[in-house]
Amino acid sequence: MKTPARGDIWLVNLNPTLGKEQQGLRPVLVVSEQAFNRLGLCVVCPITQGGQESRFAGFAVTLMGSGSETQGLVMCNQPRTVDLMARTGRFVEKVTSHVHNEVLAKLQTIFESGS
């Protein structure tokens, strides 16, 4: 299996989940660096066709018009660490650097202090 790289979209089953976590078989965007991913885990953001709550809160990046076959919203407010091999993930495609840079910028606002 290929080592996932930042900017890859993989199809993976996110179950089991709890509460408001995205669930089920869905595309995810890999946001962690390949050197980290070689350790067996990846940080991903789920992609959804819904996600209105994330969009209105400013934590979603659209794939519409990006040139990718995968469409929907990257939910930057739900980063998650997963083992893609254990979850039998499958590589789908790679997004443009513009898309993954926009996702990383949204993630940065979550983890940086405003003060």
Which positions does each model-derived feature cover?
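Conserved functional hotspots at enzyme active or ligand-binding sites that engage polyanionic ligands
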Residues: 1-115
